[in-house]
């Protein structure tokens, strides 16, 4: 970056922060002159204002700025930005929108919307998606208002897998022995507790994450009819979620495909880049800054 441009950028940032400290009560020219004089040192500038400011300063300030091209460029830019800011609220569309917002009932939902907007926050959830055509399963962090993701193999958009049909690494809480355990499973399909053998329904399906906890050597088992380690009694028609059972029975990875997404014309972004899930094998060491996770599990028994 050019030296003068970098100098102007640093000066502009310092001036804007400095004027904000005093709620804009310091004139722009005075702020620029002081920041130039004290090399952007806020403490010294504040002391100067408190101890040394008098009625003759304005004339001295203008004289200081006449031969300072960097300062003049910053003054002109900030003045231009300030003028744009003053003109913006006059926009009829903005006024109409603000008026409509003011007429909304103060419900809990609307209050949360205003609070989220004020804090530049988009509520999101981690959801599972599955493309039947590509036999591809992935997780995506999506806005709650528009839960949709695109299969990056066929490029078609899908709604998430229904919450009562999700499968993958499940978390179980046994009501008998009070033990919590994890293993491959699916919602509404019981697996026996590894300690007391009591059938337990999963409380949730976990998105793939790094460091999901210690791995166990317990062998997977569930009440599905085609489980490779089936327990008796089993439930006819239930499908086992474990990859080993899927491979042994020559079944696709996708247990319950996502429905194709029908667009409503919303302009809200369908994916969030911050804090998104990763795209890799679920059993691998995975990176935190990639957006998706392909659920392509191995057939190792060690994770339940």
Curated annotation (Swiss-Prot):
The record's GO CC annotations read: cytoplasm; nucleus; P-body
For this UniProt record, the keywords arranged alphabetically read as follows: Cytoplasm, Nucleus, RNA-binding
Gene Ontology molecular function, alphabetical: ribosome binding; RNA binding; sequence-specific mRNA binding
Q: Where is this motif: Nuclear localization signal?
A: 140-156
Record Pfam families = UPF0515
Task: State the family named in the UniProt similarity comment for this chain.
Answer: Belongs to the SHFL family.
Presence of the UniProt keyword Cytoplasm in the record: yes
Name used for this protein in its record = Shiftless antiviral inhibitor of ribosomal frameshifting protein homolog
Q: Does the keyword Cytoplasm apply?
A: yes
Q: Which residues cross the membrane?
A: none
Major subcellular site: cytoplasm
User: What domain of life?
Assistant: Eukaryota
Task: Return one Gene Ontology term, BP aspect.
Answer: negative regulation of translational frameshifting
Stated role: Inhibits programmed -1 ribosomal frameshifting (-1PRF) of a variety of mRNAs from viruses and cellular genes. Interacts with the -1PRF signal of target mRNA and translating ribosomes and causes premature translation termination at the frameshifting site. May exhibit antiviral activity.
Question: PANTHER family per the record?
Answer: REPRESSOR OF YIELD OF DENV PROTEIN, SHIFTLESS ANTIVIRAL INHIBITOR OF RIBOSOMAL FRAMESHIFTING PROTEIN
Location(s) in or outside the cell:
Cytoplasm; Nucleus; Cytoplasm, P-body
The listed location of motif Nuclear export signal is 278-287
Organism placement in taxonomy: Eukaryota, Metazoa, Chordata, Craniata, Vertebrata
């Amino acid at each position: 970056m050019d030296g003068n441009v970098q100098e102007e950028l640093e000066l502009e940032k310092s001036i804007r922060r400095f004027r904000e400290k005093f709620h804009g009560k310091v004139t722009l020219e005075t702020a620029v002159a002081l920041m130039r004089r004290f090399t952007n040192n806020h403490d010294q500038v504040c002391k100067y204002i408190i101890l040394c400011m008098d009625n003759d300063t304005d004339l001295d300030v203008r004289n200081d700025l006449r031969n300072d091209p960097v300062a003049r460029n910053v003054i002109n830019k900030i003045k231009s930005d300030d003028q744009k800011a003053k003109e913006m609220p006059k926009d009829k569309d903005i006024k109409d929108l603000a008026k409509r917002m003011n007429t909304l009932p103060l419900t809990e939902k609307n209050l949360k919307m205003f609070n989220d907007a004020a804090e530049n926050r988009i509520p999101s959830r981690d959801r599972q998606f599955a493309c039947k055509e590509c036999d591809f399963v992935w997780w995506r962090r999506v806005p709650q208002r528009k839960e949709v993701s695109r299969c990056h193999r066929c490029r078609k958009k899908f709604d998430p897998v229904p919450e009562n049909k999700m499968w993958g690494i499940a978390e179980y809480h046994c009501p008998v022995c009070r033990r919590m355990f994890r293993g491959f499973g699916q919602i509404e399909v019981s697996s026996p507790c590894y300690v007391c053998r009591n059938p337990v329904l999963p409380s949730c399906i976990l998105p793939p994450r790094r460091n999901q906890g210690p791995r166990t050597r317990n062998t997977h088992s569930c009440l599905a009819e085609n489980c490779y380690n089936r327990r008796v009694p089993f439930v006819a028609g239930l499908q086992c979620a474990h990859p080993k059972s899927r491979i042994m029975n020559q079944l696709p990875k996708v247990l319950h495909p996502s429905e194709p997404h029908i667009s409503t014309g919303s302009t809200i972004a369908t994916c969030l880049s911050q804090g998104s899930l990763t795209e890799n094998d679920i059993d691998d060491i995975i990176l935190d800054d990639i957006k998706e996770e392909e659920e392509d599990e191995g057939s190792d028994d060690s994770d339940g």
